Amino acid sequence: METRPSSSLSSPEESCEAFPQGLLVFTGSSDRDANLAKQFWIGASMYPHNESQLVLSRGSSQRLPVARPSRSSAPEKTYFQPFFLEESKSRDVTAETLKIQESEEKKKYLQKAKKRDEIIQLLRKQREERILKELISLPHKPKGKVHKAKKVISESDKEDQEEVKALD
């Protein structure tokens, strides 16, 4: 069984760092299935390709300059306090609007349910009335003639019947 991952990692040391051997254990599986599973999990780790990693030269700096702390700490407190108050107020407002929207939706669905029940009751009433009318008019309806379909017997069936009669 091969313990080295796919060629996306450049060296065996990197594969050991990415997945120590104790973590990838597939007991009860065939070697082929274990290898495929290991390749999948190593490929799914989403490490960047070596070509896409940033390389810093000695003269380049890719970091932004660090902000220096301000000398007075009192303005910071007044700056941050309104932010927290506004945030809590906005949370309250959003919570209230959510409650209002939920109550409106609930009212809307209750109205729909009430209308649905009314429609179902109306349909039941109409059905009962229709059944009563049919029962009242049933004795007065003319009785239809029962048409007996003529049996069409094919020649092969006739021959079969004649053969059966001949056997008796």
Curated annotation (Swiss-Prot):
The lineage of its organism: Eukaryota, Metazoa, Chordata, Craniata, Vertebrata. Keywords: Cell projection, Cytoplasm. Residues 142-151 have a biased composition (Basic residues). One of its GO terms (biological process) is flagellated sperm motility. GO terms for cellular component: cilium; cytoplasm. PANTHER family: CILIA- AND FLAGELLA-ASSOCIATED PROTEIN HOATZ, UPF0722 PROTEIN C11ORF88. Required for motile ciliogenesis and flagellar genesis by mediating the maturation of the glycolytic enzyme ENO4. Belongs to the HOATZ family. Residues 142-168 are annotated as: Disordered. This is Cilia- and flagella-associated protein HOATZ. InterPro entries: HOATZ-like. It is found in: Cytoplasm; Cell projection, Cilium. It comes from Bos taurus. Its main location: cytoplasm.
